[in-house]
Amino acid sequence: MKKTVRSLCSTALALTLGFTLLSGPASVQAAGNADYNLAGFSQGNTGGGIISESNTSTYKKVYNATDLALALKKNSGVKVVEIMNDLDLGWNEIPSAAQTSPFAKHNDALTHPVLKQTGVSKITVDGFNGLTIFSANGSKIKHAAITVKRSSNVIIRNLEFDELWEWDESTKGDYDKNDWDYITLEDSSGVWIDHCTFNKAYDGLVDSKKGTSGVTISWSTFKGDDGSANSWVTRQINELEANKASYPMYNYLRSSAVGLSKQDVIAISGPQKKGHLVGATSLESANANLSITLHHNLYKDIQDRMPRLRGGNAHAYNIIMDAADARSAQSRITSAMATAIASKGYKFGITSNGAISTESGAVLVEKSVIKDVQXPCTQQSDRSDQRHVHR
């Protein structure tokens, strides 16, 4: 079911005309191509500027974790970071020379067989004013979460982020333990994320909080897992299937009490749970400063938060929210199965929300396509408390 409605949140949503979108990482576009120029709340952002590769004090080519640690160290003076190849950045797979600021050990993996081996790193980009991180070839960053804090005039371009999800047993499917987001923006201004691809993650994909303003996310793809034979989710479910006794929630879903097949679990686990949280703390005074633009993005089987706004302003245009496969996966759970799952306190199913605005936040979604999203725009707070109502 495709929805093209004209009354959404506080303003309007209309059918996209002439929409084009990249399906994956793309080469950096030639300068002067107006279709790819910066627009939205991050207007005027120049990142690290135009710097010659020969200026090795401010232009760093990164081939490994140690190179990246040196380039992103606070007060490094680096302005442009070019990622030259795929980087595996889990805490257990980077050398000791890289196990220092800005790298830190993230929360331990508990269930995914790969992440239990590689570990997960947290990379903090702190105090930069003018920084570009990009790849000319669409390099992939795996097993790491990046936090940009107290920074301004930052560009992140043409990168792919992958392998940061695992099955959640510890909070019974609520995914409230590991706090792994690919990118978190904190107390920053002027951040442009462009031509990137974000695969399934444990928590959010790109979150913005602590009053971060002037954010634009453009020409990017956000997607769940496709459930193929060697996909990230399939590898996780294979581990659970082989060790059911160690995973009570999974074992229950597969038991006769519920009756889901292994393939059912893979399909239902595939869609990404959350997109963009904008404002992490309810009623925080800094939330009024939040501002974000989303344009020319594909959200493929994202269940929620496109975006989820607590105060401030968000503008989304020329985006596609396509939840067709997620809707199909949800149909695998019968009402009797849902009752059985809930009776044990487990959370396993598909949410279907689009844009959410509360706490006097305003979202404008226009010139976009929404397909098979049950609640294209909603408010998840108590309407009786006017502090939680959108503008």
Curated annotation (Swiss-Prot):
Q: Which GO terms describe its cellular component?
A: extracellular region
Thermoactivity: Optimum temperature is 40 degrees Celsius.
Question: What is the required cofactor set for this protein?
Answer: Ca(2+)
The entry's localization annotation reads: Secreted
- Tell me about pH and activity: Optimum pH is 9.5.
Task: State a single Gene Ontology molecular function.
Answer: pectate lyase activity
Q: What's the protein name?
A: Pectate lyase B
